[in-house]
Amino acid sequence: MKHSSLIPVERIEKAIYLIRGEKVMLDRDLAALYEVETRVLNQAVGRNRERFPPDFMFELTREEITGISQTVTSSNLKFSKRVSVFTEQGVAMLSSVLRSKRAISVNIEVMRI
């Protein structure tokens, strides 16, 4: 069965990184997909911290940020103080804390990849 795509598959695939042996997505990339500011996404996570154990979400080290910023085009990532990444389970949990139809739709598409 073919699904209509809200977001091009290539856009999602380009936003997936392998860090610490886990496939993860950056907070800023997810915020862009959900059409919210990164700050808003991180505030929602902060209010629901118990839903995001370390195997769902973790902060990158300075070295990890430097490594990723070399592959991200036109990135100001290396100037960010904190960068959070989300595993597949963390991405699934985000729709429950963002509580929007867009978040649910985006998560379904991310899970299908």
Annotated model-derived regions:
Residues 1-113:
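Basic, low-complexity intrinsically disordered segments
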